[in-house]
Amino acid sequence: ADPLWIVDGVPGSAPNFNDIESIEILKDAASTAIYGARGAGGVILVTTKKGKIGKLSINARVNFGIETPIDLPDMLHTVDFIDRKLAAGFPNNPNSGWDNPASLPDTDWEDLVWRNAFRQNYFLQMTGGNEKTTFNMSAEFYKNQFIERYSFEDAGNFRVASQTNISKRVKFSEILTVGFNNTDPHLYGQTNNDYVYYRQVPTMVPYDNTNEAGGGWGKHPAGGYYEGPNHVATLMSHHENERRFWARANA
């Protein structure tokens, strides 16, 4: 079972870790004794950062990163592919162009599927206050590419926590958090996974403007054996966008 998150005394979900002031983990009998069945998977108690009396403090951070695919297998070029097909006894279709391999496409499917993925993260936090009011505000945005082309994740959140001393005995505090998440992870099925392209041939092209009936996507010119679906067409035309917006307020 997943743990139960208690954020500033209220059950919720995991907060932005940049906003955490302290964290405590309860498990086993201690968690179930206090929170019942909801705490069966453990309880994580979180206290988030609050405003402090003093001069305005600004904390900013920008991170960049890159992720690159490694140890990809070497794929056959058109000339080597045809040589091995003929050596294995496949018939030389006169319309296939195998007699002149140099005239045929030489598609690098690995380059069309994988990429160097860039990651960006921006964080800004402001804290300050006086005897009357204190506040803590933070905002974060990240934009991530995945190493498979046409897949990504964008997300961001904004949080403000403030406390106002109305009188010596009366205080008003509030915490407001809003955020969003937009991702396209490419969910896979039998014909849509990153290993289909290993079965595609270099003589097949990803795009073909003459193939209007097929949406302009390339197809194998000769056929006669399995060349796999056009994986580039699958990546570009099948999207599984997930968009979430959320808000949480405590007072």
List each model region and its residues.
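Periplasmic plug
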Residues: A1-A29, R61, N136-S138
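Short beta-turn/strand-loop junction motif enriched in small, turn-promoting residues
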Residues: V10-G12, D28-T32, T47-K49, Y142-N144
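Short clusters of hydrophobic/aromatic residues that line enzyme substrate/ligand-binding pockets
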Residues: I34-Y35, V113
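Transmembrane beta-barrel strand/turn architecture of Gram-negative outer membrane proteins
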Residues: E21, G39-E67, K132-N211, L235-A251
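Residues embedded in well-ordered regular secondary structure
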Residues: P3-L4, G42, K50-Y150, H186-Q190, ...
